[in-house]
Swiss-Prot record:
Induction: By cold shock, 10 degrees Celsius (at protein level).
Superkingdom classification of source: Bacteria
UniProt miscellaneous comment: Uses the non-canonical initiation codon AUU, which may limit its expression.
Species whose genome carries this gene: Escherichia coli (strain K12)
InterPro entries for the chain: YmcF-like (IPR056946)
Family of the protein in this entry: Belongs to the YmcF/YnqF peptide family.
The protein, known as: Protein YmcF
Amino acid sequence: MTQHLHFRCPCCHGSQYRTSAFDVTERNPLGAKCIFCKSTMITFDNVALQIRTDHAPLDFTK
């Protein structure tokens, strides 16, 4: 079984990345960095969690 991970950049919202053994840290265990802004990439399942914690819910009223 092959597991495919989808990464997203939290800064520029890009999805292109490179991996390097030199970039492996506790917060970035796979060593993935954005090729555009060099930020640490996050997995797509963490993007939804970050959006929920960073933004207040929007209430639409008429």
